[in-house]
Amino acid sequence: MNDKKLYISDVTLRDGMHAIRHQYSLENVRQVAKALDDARVDSIEVAHGDGLQGSSFNYGFGAHSDLEWIEAAADVVKHAKIATLLLPGIGTIHDLKNAWQAGARVVRVATHCTEADVSAQHIQYARELGMDTVGFLMMSHMTTPENLAKQAKLMEGYGATCIYVVDSGGAMNMSDIRDRFRALKAVLKPETQTGIHAHHNLSLGVANSIAAVEEGCDRIDASLAGMGAGAGNAPLEVFIAAADKLGWQHGTDLYALMDAADDLVRPLQDRPVRVDRETLALGYAGVYSSFLRHCETAAARYGLSAVDILVELGKRRMVGGQEDMIVDVALDLRNNK
């Protein structure tokens, strides 16, 4: 690792939405965004957990609109860029333009790891707007490193200047991460950046992020207190402490991040964001982390174990966007009891 500065991308106000069913108040957003900005992170992602226009029956309704959340963050931020997430098929280019007008300057266009071809229009439009445009390959554990690299190359061709390996299921280990970054680096242009988005379901969020940086990764997603889907993301303050120990340049204030994690974020959790029986099952079965709260609801409704539902979803290789299948699986399990 040379002396390059890592790009620290906070996702507390987007992935963290999943942990509290998309119920951040505008004041929560202002407080967290200001604390992150004061700690000098590079970008702060703000949106419904499932991206622009994710507020819906399928994914869960948000306490506010994406634009209200983005405007609230943009109002208090002086240093960091406001980022947002867009999943083609949920959000449109019109939603992206509205987000840009509200203050978003970075967009991560997210697709399933084998479906990069649906991102062309959105990536091209983001570039036309002048946004920092990132390709985000979700559930990256579900395809081979070589296939992932081909998908990354497509996104690069559409205009993305950074491509992310996204461990949405928190299912990968350090070797899996290394293999994918080596495959991406072998085909992407030298100037195209790479990023890592880890989940902590196997307690490897920080270790996987470190492995990614050792393979040349430029941008690291993390969240305060790990606030995110499943067992959460790589905890930002923990990653920064580890990076500091390694002598890496990150430009952030560790103690300010520690304070924000414990004083602002942990008190908001109505269900602890941690590795436990259910979230470990997510990582072990390779299931989309944001299925957690939906599965727990279905388990309570139908008198089942959430772990049984999660394991069955893993066997059926369900992916993000198939939240409606959780109830189907629960009914199948109940009927087969």
Swiss-Prot record:
Residues under site feature: Transition state stabilizer: 14
Domain Pyruvate carboxyltransferase, first and last residues per copy: 6-258
Assembly and binders: Interacts with MhpF.
Record's catalysed reaction(s): (S)-4-hydroxy-2-oxopentanoate = acetaldehyde + pyruvate
Residues where substrate binds: 14-15, 168, 197, 288
Binding site for Mn(2+): 15, 197, 199
The organism of origin for this protein: Escherichia coli (strain SMS-3-5 / SECEC)
Family: Belongs to the 4-hydroxy-2-oxovalerate aldolase family.
Catalytic residues of the enzyme: 18
Gene3D superfamilies per UniProt: 1.10.8.60, Aldolase class I
SUPFAM superfamilies hit by this protein: Aldolase (SSF51569), post-HMGL domain-like (SSF89000)
The protein, known as: 4-hydroxy-2-oxovalerate aldolase
Lineage summary: Bacteria, Pseudomonadati, Pseudomonadota, Gammaproteobacteria, Enterobacterales
EC number: 4.1.3.39
Function summary: Catalyzes the retro-aldol cleavage of 4-hydroxy-2-oxopentanoate to pyruvate and acetaldehyde. Is involved in the meta-cleavage pathway for the degradation of aromatic compounds.
Gene Ontology MF terms in the entry: 2-isopropylmalate synthase activity; 4-hydroxy-2-oxovalerate aldolase activity; manganese ion binding
Keyword Manganese: yes
Any one GO BP annotation for this protein: 3-phenylpropionate catabolic process
